[in-house]
């Protein structure tokens, strides 16, 4: 159970490169932020890392990396309240940017990795060009589920629309 507000369970934070090689960053992460907002279309986050072993150089970070972890509040057992970004059961986040890279002293590098959900990355790379006929909620579901478009595997929560429309996106 939680002793203090803000307590959390985080067993590991793996940075996985394009070859599938993973490095546990749990002990070199200074700060982790996760952002979710009704005003944004995806979950994003950042982690600040103190790197004394040149892990970023050894992994050959090139923009195809993923970050895998499971984050929960102590005492939480409901899967819906767990942020599962693991390789086995969830959907790892994708690294899209490295910022604030600083050489603090000889052998110690500090930098920030920015990451986002798989859907965020697919949305950046995918253009929808199609006509839809019917309820708009069905068109949105099709775009989100279709393998050619967003291809989300997440459970969707939506409200049915009452009218039928023709729309070209």
Regions found by a protein language model. Give the residues of each.
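Surface-exposed cap/loop segments at beta↔alpha junctions
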Residues: 55-168
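Juxtamembrane "anchor/assembly" segments of surface/extracellular structural proteins
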Residues: 1-78, 111-122, 138
């Amino acid at each position: 159970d939680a002793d203090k507000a803000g307590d959390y369970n985080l067993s590991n934070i793996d940075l996985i490169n394009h070859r599938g090689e993973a490095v546990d960053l749990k002990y070199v992460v200074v700060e982790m932020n996760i952002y979710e907002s009704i005003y944004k279309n995806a979950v994003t986050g950042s982690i600040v890392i103190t790197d004394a072993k040149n892990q970023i150089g050894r992994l050959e970070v090139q923009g195809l990396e993923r970050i895998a972890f499971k984050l929960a509040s102590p005492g939480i057992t409901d899967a819906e309240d767990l942020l599962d970004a693991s390789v086995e059961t969830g959907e790892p986040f994708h690294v899209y940017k490295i910022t604030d890279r600083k050489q603090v002293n000889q052998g110690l590098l500090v930098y920030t990795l920015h990451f986002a959900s798989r859907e965020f990355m697919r949305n950046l790379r995918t253009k929808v060009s199609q006509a839809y006929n019917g309820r708009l909620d069905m068109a949105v579901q099709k775009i989100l589920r279709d393998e050619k478009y967003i291809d989300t595997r997440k459970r969707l929560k939506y409200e049915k629309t009452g009218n039928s429309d023709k729309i070209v996106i």
